[in-house]
């Protein structure tokens, strides 16, 4: 059990038979009446976001999540197949379960899979990934006086804005949280 006073961004709670992650929270102490905590919760299963208000000090069940490191081995139709490198068990996840992170997922990549009651609910990618640029416009010297950017498609199909000097075949480092270019990789 966790008190609503202890809510922080990223806290996971169990409510109405689902796992919810606290996206935003605000402790409110009105001049008249008792204090309360206003929250925005995101469902780990469906991705829905709801606003919910808790009384200050209200006890809520905390969700017990298990985190395991799995390797993405291959695609089978629309499913992503992952393997536990210790037990060699395979786990299949749909694109919806993986979410937006699937655009950076490539075979052989290790990710953390978060499970609740033995059901995978979320995939955590590394903070940065190194991918090869497969498609981009050629950058011509003297195009701009200051640093400009152009769109580039990487090997997984994701589109990232990169500096003008990046060309096809180069490996670049991308921040998976902000979808931004971090630098070249050799």
From Swiss-Prot:
Keywords: Cytoplasm, Elongation factor, Protein biosynthesis. One of its GO terms (biological process) is peptide biosynthetic process. GO terms for cellular component: cytoplasm. PROSITE patterns: EFP (PS01275). Pathway: Protein biosynthesis; polypeptide chain elongation. It is found in: Cytoplasm. GO terms for molecular function: translation elongation factor activity. Pfam families: EFP (PF01132), EFP_N (PF08207), Elong-fact-P_C (PF09285). Involved in peptide bond synthesis. Stimulates efficient translation and peptide-bond synthesis on native or reconstituted 70S ribosomes in vitro. Probably functions indirectly by altering the affinity of the ribosome for aminoacyl-tRNA, thus increasing their reactivity as acceptors for peptidyl transferase. Belongs to the elongation factor P family. This is Elongation factor P. The gene is efp.
């Amino acid at each position: 059990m966790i008190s609503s006073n202890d809510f922080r961004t990223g806290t996971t709670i169990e409510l109405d038979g689902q796992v919810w992650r606290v996206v935003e929270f605000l402790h409110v102490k009105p001049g008249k009446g008792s204090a309360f905590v206003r929250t925005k919760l995101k469902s780990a299963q469906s991705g829905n976001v709801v606003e919910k208000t808790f009384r200050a000090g209200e006890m809520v069940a905390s969700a017990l999540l298990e985190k395991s490191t799995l390797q993405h081995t291959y695609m089978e139709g629309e499913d992503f197949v992952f393997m536990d490198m210790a037990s060699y068990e395979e786990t299949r996840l749909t694109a919806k379960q993986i979410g937006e992170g699937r655009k950076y997922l490539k075979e052989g990549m290790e990710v953390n899979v978060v499970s609740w009651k033995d059901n995978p609910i979320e995939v955590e990618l590394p903070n940065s990934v190194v991918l090869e640029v497969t498609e981009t416009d050629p950058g011509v010297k003297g195009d701009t006086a200051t640093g400009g950017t152009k769109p580039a498609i990487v090997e997984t199909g994701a589109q990232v804005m990169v500096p003008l000097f990046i060309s096809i075949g180069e490996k670049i480092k991308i921040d998976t949280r902000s979808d931004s270019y971090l630098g070249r990789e050799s």
